[in-house]
Design a protein with these regions (language model features):
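Conserved SAM/AdoMet-binding glycine-rich loop
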Residues: 1-125, 130-133
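Conserved small/polar residues in nucleotide/adenosyl-binding loops
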Residues: 216-218
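Catalytic cores of alpha/beta
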Residues: 133-148
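Catalytic cores of glycan-processing enzymes that make or break glycosidic bonds
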Residues: 52, 143, 175-176
Length: 218
């Protein structure tokens, strides 16, 4: 359970543990996860146990105990760790239920320090998404600047695709944020979705024309 309250009464209605900010009742610990990884490492004939993705970096940043990040870097990363900041615009991240981009930057810095201390060469691969409800071309430019500043060169970018029973899909089809009932923009034409994606992959020469059109359009 995320907290003692959830253990007794179940999940809170209309609330998220980590969004828009971490709940004060949230129990932050990686002890069980770390204990499992240590047991796996101790198994005979097991040389390595790699974690490729699936970690919540915002949750990791709430943990005052550095043991998990240290052991993750030392034993469980095979060169690259895939994480999901998804966007760089705080407004878009809010619609996604994700933390501000500053949290990811703190995690990236902590990962880099831990990697250097371990004497290893390991890198973060950022999972990014274009055209999520709430994202405009201006937001895509902000994401492109983040990609530039972090030294990333994303070969793949996930374009938002509506799937059933998600808040994001509700936003996409209704044009409303169901949590606030405020109007929300969603890119729907193939052309604008392509422009947002091209801005993120602006280093690709094939995207030059779309990037120019995007900047003119803004």
């Amino acid at each position: 359970p995320a907290c003692d309250k959830q253990l007794k009464t179940g999940a809170c209605v209309g609330k998220r543990c980590l969004s828009p900010k971490p709940c004060k009742n949230l129990r932050v610990t990686h002890e069980d996860y770390l204990a499992l990884l240590r047991k796996l490492r101790a198994l005979p004939n097991v040389k390595k146990v790699f974690i490729r993705s699936g970690l919540r970096f915002d949750y990791m940043m709430l943990d005052d105990d550095p043991s998990f990040l240290r052991e993750l870097v030392e034993h469980h990363v095979s060169g690259q760790l895939r994480v999901a900041p998804e966007h760089a615009s705080d407004a878009v991240l809010m619609t996604m239920g994700k933390p501000p981009i500053s949290v990811f930057k703190r995690f990236a810095a902590a990962f880099k320090r831990a990697t250097k201390k371990a004497g290893l060469k390991q890198y973060l691969v950022a999972y990014l998404m274009s055209s999520h409800p709430g994202a405009t071309l201006a937001d895509a430019v902000e994401l492109a600047e983040f990609v530039r500043d972090m030294g990333y060169n994303p070969e793949q970018v996930q374009d938002f695709y509506p799937t059933p029973s998600t808040i994001s899909t509700c936003m996409y089809y209704t044009g409303l944020d169901p949590r606030t009932m405020e109007p929300i923009y969603a890119a729907k034409t193939p052309h604008e979705k392509a422009m947002q994606r091209a801005l993120i992959q602006y280093r690709n020469p094939k995207n030059r024309k779309l990037v120019e059109l995007s900047l003119i359009h803004i």
